[in-house]
């Protein structure tokens, strides 16, 4: 396993954590809140964003304009059943989601959720590190690389691990500030 591959895997983990953070509601309208919603459409699970145009006309509203008006009921149902905690209102052409201000208790819950997602990302990075170091030690035992090369590679993997974990911690700090800002 090459160092570049390890860093690439770690970067993908950071990006995945960032996407997970984007789905956490902060009190401001953000179309990415609906990224994980799938709609039962003609018997198939279809992502909401492929069935409608999603926009944020103001800081507290998300507007969803379905390409096919017959899908409005299914979209409303999917949003109601999802974990976003928003109630859709339908005017016949557009589905609107009003984002209520977050209570302090809800903000604390969201900070805990963000911390949990960050921890999952850090665990994934540590697992990548463990796999990489195991592969390096295996190559050393097989006499493919020297003990010094093995130690150098392990140090590089550890430095990469520290760097990517710090990135996740920075993302978490930013998200926590975002959530706690009224």
UniProtKB/Swiss-Prot annotation:
The gene is frr. SUPFAM superfamilies: Ribosome recycling factor, RRF. This is Ribosome-recycling factor. Pfam families: RRF. The keyword Thylakoid does not apply. InterPro entries: Ribosome_recyc_fac, Ribosome_recyc_fac_dom, RRF_sf. Belongs to the RRF family. Keywords: Cytoplasm, Protein biosynthesis. Responsible for the release of ribosomes from messenger RNA at the termination of protein biosynthesis. May increase the efficiency of translation by recycling ribosomes from one round of translation to another. One of its GO terms (biological process) is translational termination. It comes from Microcystis aeruginosa (strain NIES-843 / IAM M-2473). One of its GO terms (molecular function) is ribosomal large subunit binding. GO terms for cellular component: cytoplasm. It is found in: Cytoplasm.
